[in-house]
C-alpha cells in the first residue's frame, strides 16, 4: 500500500506536466496566444489613428478568418482541453465579431468613394454569410427578393407594400429601388420598407398552423385593423395558407372584421447552407428583420392578446425607446454558471469599454441606460446571474431606430455563447445594450393566470397553469403566452405512464387527455413575490405547469377578475378553443 502511494506521488508531476503540454500544443495548433487579455478591434478603432476603411482593408486582406461570422454548432460534449480554453476563446470570438460589426456600421456612414462601397460589399458576404449575395449580384437579381402573397392570391416580388396611414388598408406597391452605392442593410431599411408602417408579424411553419388560426380568430374579435404578415421559408404549404386565409376572411360574423392577411416567403434571400439553421425560435429574426413593416408587433403563434394591439404603440416606454419587451417568469434557482457570467461580463466590458465589475463602471452603465427597467435587466444578469428575464411572445421593435441590432442579435444567437440562454429571448435586449441603444421592459412583473385553487385559509391562494400572463397597471390582462387550453402539448400518454402522481389523479389516459384539451378558466392573476415565494414547477403538461402563491400581507399580489372581465375573457377562451 505504501509503495503504491509512493508510485502515485512520483507519477503525479508527470501526469500534470503531460496535461499541461497537451494544452500548450493544442493552443499552438489552434494559434491561440499564450497571453490573452481580450484586446479587441474596437479599442484600435477608437484610437483615431487609423481610418475605418483602412482598418477594414487590413482585416479583409490579412485576417479573413477573423472576419467571417460563421454559425457555430452547439457542442454538448466537451473535452478537458476545450473546457479549459473555451471561456477565453468564446470571449475573443464574440468580442471580435461584435467589433467587426461595429466597424462595418461605422464605415457604412463614412462612404466617400467607389472603392469604399466595393470593400463594404465584399465584407458583407463574410459578416452576413446567411444572405444570398450571389443571387443579389447576379443578372437575375430580381429573383433574390422575397415574395409577397396577398389573401386574394396576388403575388409581388421586388415590391414595397404600401398601407394607408389613416386606416392601415392596402393601397398598392412601389418597386424596391436598391442602390449599388449603399451598404446592404441601409439599402434594405431605406428602400424595402414603407416609412412609419405598422403591422403584426408572425413566423409560421406547418406545425404552428392550428395555433395561428386560433390567434387570427382572436385578432378578429379584437377588431384588429393592423395588416398581418406571416413569414416563412417556403415551408408553409399552400393548403395551410388557404386555411389561414379562411380564418382571416370568412364572413361568419359581421362583428368580426376580415383581416388584411399577407404571406412573405424569404427563402430566396437566404443561402441554402444556412436555410436549415433558422428553425424554431431563430425564425423570429427572419420575421422581424424582413417583414414589410418598419414598426412590427411580433407575436408567437400561441400568444393570445386581450386588448387591441395598436393600443400597445401608445405605451410610454415604447414611445420613448422604440422598443417594448415583457418579463419572463423569474426563477431564483435557474442561474447562469459563474463561467458564463464571467464570459458575458468580459464581452460587455470589451464592447462598451467599461468595467461592469467595478462600482464606478456599473454606475456609468446605469447612467447610459437611463431606464429603470433596462437597469434592472442588467443587474439581474450581472449580479443575480438570472438566466430567464424576457418573454418574447410579444415584441414591439422600431427598425428605423434600432435596425442594426437585428444582425447583431442574429450573430449572438448563432455564436459560441448561444447555449447561455434559452432560444432567442435575451438576445433581443442584449444586442441593444451592447449597441448602446435605448430599450425598456413593461414595468409590471410576469404573472400566473387561471383558476384559483381552494385555499388552505381565507387569506392564501394558489394558481397553477401553463399560461404566462401580462397585466397592465390596473390588473387587466394585456396578453398571455401558452394558448388557452389547459395543456397545449400532446403529452397525456407520457404523463400518465411516467408520472405516478398524475396517474393517481385520473382514471385513464382518455380522462387526462380530455382535461389537458379543455379550455382554461381565467378567474384571477397572481403576481408572485419571488424573494419569498417563487414560481414552483409542477409535473403536469411535461413539467410546463407552474404555480404561484399569495398570502395576504406577506407575499404576492392577487388580482381577482370582476364578473364583466370574466365574461369577456370567457368569450376569448371559447373562440380560441373552437375546433380548427
UniProtKB/Swiss-Prot annotation:
One of its GO terms (molecular function) is alpha-1,3-mannosyltransferase activity. It is an enzyme of class 2 (transferase). Residues 30-580 are lumenal. The chain crosses the membrane at residues 11-29. Its EC number is 2.4.1.-. The keyword Glycosyltransferase applies. Pfam families: Mannosyl_trans3. Residues 1-10 are cytoplasmic. It comes from the Eukaryota. Its main location: membrane. It is a single-pass type II membrane protein. One of its GO terms (biological process) is protein O-linked glycosylation. This is Probable alpha-1,3-mannosyltransferase MNT4. The lineage of its organism: Eukaryota, Fungi, Dikarya, Ascomycota, Saccharomycotina.
